[in-house]
Every structure is written in structure tokens, then in C-alpha cells.
Amino acid sequence: MTAVVDSYNWSSKFDGVTSRNLDDALTVTLGGSYDFGVAKAYLSGQYFDNMLANDATNAAAQKDTMDTYASFGSYFNGKAFKGYSILAGMDAPVLGGKALFAVGYTDAKDADGSDALGKTELSRYGASVGYTYDLSRRTNVYAVAAYYKDSVDKDASSSHQDHDPSTATIYAGIRHTF
């Protein structure tokens, strides 16, 4: 079992005079796992408030990504957002390797209510399956396939319409540890 509480001091990044004046951000994350013997289950959840996308200082760049699939923070046009996410997963030994499965859900909305850019609400669903196989004590191969579906809702005052982008990703590789 793990619990983490983080606070982000936005006043150290934004001075509130020439740029933004935001309340400090907060995340609370809980997670744990349990080994049932035949399979290991994982569960985690996170609450977040007053968070910003990685590139929140460049709202114009974010606006250009609205018609493509992006990190969900970019849907908020540089505004702070709040919400929660949950993730459940499982791994089990299969054919000498390990099969992996996970599902997740995120729900987020504007932290400050609506403004001139319009109110935004987002839901994201995701699922992934994978497999890893040890070739030796220090080397393994892996493959993962994932699918994510977003539902972005904008109010009438927004310059962007509602849209539901999705993405599918497949990757594979070999890992060697030293």
C-alpha cells in the first residue's frame, strides 16, 4: 500500500501580476497490490486540483493541438483543472512469461469554473494488454497494446466544439538491466 500527497507552489512559477495568480495545486495518490498466488492485482486512484498541463505557459501551442489527440491537460487551454483517476490492473504467469492487463478512467473539469475560454469537461477511458518474457536473468522482451478514448465537452462560449478523440498504441522491445 502506498499513499502520496504532493503540493505544487504555483506562486514560485507565476507572479500573479504579469502572469497568472493560481492557488497551489494538490494531488493525493493511493495505490496498492495484492498477490493472490495465481495472479497479482493492482489498484490505484488519484485526486488532483489546480493542476496545469506540462506546457501551460504556452496556451497558443495547446490551442493548436485541440484537433488532435493530446495529453488531457492540453484540452484545458492553459487553465487549471481538477478531477480524479482510477486504475486497476492484473498480471499473471502465462506460458513462462507474464500476461498484463489494465483499465483506467479519468474525469476532469475546469478548476475555476467557466471563463472567456469556456468551460471544459473531460472523461478518458483506457485499457491495455501486454506480455513480458524473460530471456535470461537480466534480459526480457515485452509487447503492449493500449487504447484510449476521450470525451471532451465544451460549453457554448468555447471556440472549440465537443469532440471524442481516441488513440491506439502498440509497442514492443527488449530490455537489458545492468
Which residues make up each language-model segment?
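Extracytoplasmic/periplasmic mature domains of Sec-exported, cell-envelope-associated bacterial proteins
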Residues: 24-26, 125, 137, 149, ...
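Short loop/turn motifs that connect adjacent beta-strands in outer-membrane beta-barrel proteins
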Residues: 93-96, 135-141
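Short Gly/Pro-enriched loop/turn and capping motifs at secondary-structure junctions
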Residues: 106-110, 134-138, 148-151
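A glycine-biased, small/acidic residue-tolerant capping/turn segment at secondary-structure junctions
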Residues: 112-114, 142-144, 151-162
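Outer-membrane beta-barrel "beta-signal"
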Residues: 165-178
